């Protein structure tokens, strides 16, 4: 029987918000701050919300307008307190106002008559990547790269099994040592979970740690094994709190009277076949997780490769775009996709395009076509969807850009405004440099185009993505120049990632 292993899961607390607070010499745990690009619209997503602001029931991925509305609600209550305490001031408009406001939680707790304020920090993705790299190097002082898996910019899994006897530490002591050094070096607090498998480490961090008191630095560390998991979490709700259990899965489970992991475990004893009928091969994962089991270890997750490979580009437009401007965006996205394929030395067999229409098409009246409901429950025209397959795998811009534009023309209703566009390169494979040719194929022209793409890519990599652009990228409504200055669809914060004043 294999020896029991010990895993850590470490999550940096409200990472983007914490970086912004530290760079402003503010306490990440007591400063009210959201990371959001307010220059877009108030519908923009908050990439992070500081812990003290979350305490007012503002979720971590709220829309900015939702945060604004919630703060207004809180301040309406606080203003009544200020009036009762005769600390409010009456303005020239005859209305009462706060005498003062604060974005510091300690000050707000000490004086209920203060108005709640907060900082809106524009995202600086390059800065976050730099800090994440610094923190990763801290982990590497204690463990080998082979035993650590970064699952995201702010979360890692570590197999510490072999390090506990080496350092003469318990898992809790080693986790605390690493988390403390991260805090000392960066000012950023972390939460850690310890488990006998990766799944339990993740749940210890995500669920159990949230319900235990933090230490003076805001650090929480929780532990789970198979037995304590069943004791602590078999009755936990909602099921969506559990790793890899999304709303769709939960809905199907609840249809069969399964509301907790304990319910699922008990159901699996006699109803395993039924679970496989409902979920197919995914039933195995659900059953394992219900019992607190996870067979995959560090080696397996590091070596995992998806069965199908694709590369995608997607964006939500800042305003509703008419047909012609949306077509320009599709051509720009296809060009970006082409350069990504060229850089990775990949080719694609086909392109899939999805065009999402704006709600204004329904709100204005007159639309009588098919509809769907968006994530906010609003009625919008049904998205357009289509695929074009190439005669042979390719990464040539002349093919990808032109065929993407033709596909847009074929599937998109020119009378509707567009809000979302997603372009996928499907079944990407290594570029073997082989062309499917016939008597009419100009192979010299193909080679010339490929060399030109590689030359342009070299210039972009050396001097920046905006060093070489088509004239169309300077047209009104074009987004390539702006997107080239972003990381993951958000502002990099300038070439040096510096704090904006």
Give the ranges of each region predicted by the language model:
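Gly/Gly-Pro- and Ser/Thr-rich, intrinsically disordered tail segments characteristic of DNA damage-repair
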Residues: 1-288, 295-298, 443-501
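DNA-contacting surface of Y-family translesion DNA polymerases
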Residues: 2, 9, 241, 247-417, ...
């Amino acid at each position: 029987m294999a020896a029991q292993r010990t895993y850590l899961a470490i999550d940096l607390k409200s990472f983007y918000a914490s970086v912004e607070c530290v760079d402003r010499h503010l306490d990440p745990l007591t400063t009210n701050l959201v990371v959001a690009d307010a220059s877009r619209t108030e519908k923009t997503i908050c990439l992070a919300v500081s812990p003290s602001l979350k305490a007012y029931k503002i979720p971590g991925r709220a829309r900015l307008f939702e945060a604004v509305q919630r703060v207004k609600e809180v301040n309406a209550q606080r203003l009544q307190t200020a009036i009762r305490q005769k600390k409010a001031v009456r303005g020239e408009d005859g209305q009462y106002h706060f005498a003062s406001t604060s974005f510091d939680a300690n000050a707000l707790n000490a004086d209920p008559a203060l108005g709640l304020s907060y900082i809106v920090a524009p995202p600086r993705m390059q800065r976050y990547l730099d800090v994440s790299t610094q923190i990763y190097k801290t982990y590497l002082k204690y463990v080998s790269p082979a035993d650590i898996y970064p699952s995201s910019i702010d979360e890692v899994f570590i197999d510490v099994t072999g390090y506990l006897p080496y350092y003469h530490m318990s898992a809790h002591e080693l986790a605390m040592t690493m988390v403390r050094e991260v805090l000392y070096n960066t000012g950023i607090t972390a939460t850690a979970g310890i488990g006998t498998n990766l799944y339990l480490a993740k749940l210890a961090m995500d669920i159990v740690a949230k319900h235990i008191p933090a230490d003076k630095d805001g650090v929480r560390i929780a532990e789970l094994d198979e037995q304590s998991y069943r004791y602590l979490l078999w009755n936990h709700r909602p099921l969506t709190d559990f790793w890899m259990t999304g709303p769709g899965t939960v809905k199907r489970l609840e249809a069969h009277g399964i509301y907790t992991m304990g319910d699922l475990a008990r159901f699996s004893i006699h109803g395993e076949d039924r679970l496989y009928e409902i979920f197919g091969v995914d039933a195995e994962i659900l059953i394992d997780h219900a019992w607190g089991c996870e067979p995959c270890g560090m080696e397996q997750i590091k070596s995992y490769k998806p069965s199908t490979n694709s590369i995608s580009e997607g964006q939500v437009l800042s305003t509703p775009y008419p047909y012609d401007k949306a077509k320009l965006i599709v051509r720009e996205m296809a060009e970006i996709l082409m350069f990504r394929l060229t850089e990775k030395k990949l080719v694609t067999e086909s392109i899939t395009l999805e065009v999402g229409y704006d709600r204004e098409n329904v709100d204005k009246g007159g639309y009588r076509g098919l509809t769907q409901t968006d994530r906010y429950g609003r009625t919008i025209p049904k998205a357009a969807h289509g695929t074009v397959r190439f005669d042979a795998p390719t990464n040539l811009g002349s093919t990808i850009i032109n065929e993407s534009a033709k596909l847009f023309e074929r599937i998109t209703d020119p009378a509707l405004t567009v809000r979302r566009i997603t372009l996928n390169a499907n079944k990407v494979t290594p570029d073997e440099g082989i062309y499917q040719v016939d008597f009419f194929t100009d192979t010299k022209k193909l080679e010339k185009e490929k060399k030109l793409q590689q030359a342009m890519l070299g210039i972009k990599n050396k001097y920046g993505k905006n060093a070489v652009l088509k004239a169309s990228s300077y047209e009104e409504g074009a987004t390539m120049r702006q997107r080239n200055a972003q990381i993951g669809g958000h502002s990099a914060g300038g070439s040096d990632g510096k704090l904006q004043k």
